[in-house]
Amino acid sequence: MARNTKESILMASLEMFSRNGYAGTNIRELSASLGMVKSGVYKHFASKEDIWNALLDKMVAYYDQRFGSPEHLPPVPDSLEEFLAMTMQMVDFTVHDEKIIMIRKVLMIEQFRDERAKELATKHFLTGLTQMFTHVFAGMIEKELLKSDDPEMLAFAYTAPISSLIHLCDREPEKTDEALKQVEAFSRYFIKVHEGEAP
């Protein structure tokens, strides 16, 4: 039961942090949203900062398991169509999973206040993506699916526009379908430009 209460507190916190930011979220409103009193929340977490850090830990694990990370690298595709399918699956997940959308908003809001949020924003929006796709492209070059090139530069060139379109979905959710079509069109263009000569 205590575990379920902790989970409920963390999920309610995620919703409030993504909507109001850390400073705009208070324990009284958080506890009221759960039908609890403040002391009930403090039975599980010592402070708002304690909730914040536990939430980041939980969300990092959730993201890494479902999307991937430099510590949880995706497999190298065996074909260009498989690569396209992998890309679309990853993007579809990140623009439709409610928890991921909220944690991305939290990181965007809090990256200028909190050092850990800044580091996670840099990792999830830039360096982590580049590292993951450097691994993917190095493997695809080795399999001759792509022309020989610098895999890190390919990864940077590939992920930056896609990341921008994901942020567009957060700002303007009504454009999500259009953004997904743009991601697919860009991915197909990228493949066409960099396609290797595998048999």
Model-identified regions with their sequence ranges:
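Hydrophobic alpha-helical connector segments
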Residues: A54, G68-I100, L154-Y158, L180-V183
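Short helix-capping/turn signature of helix-turn-helix
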Residues: Y22, F45, V106-D114, H124-F125
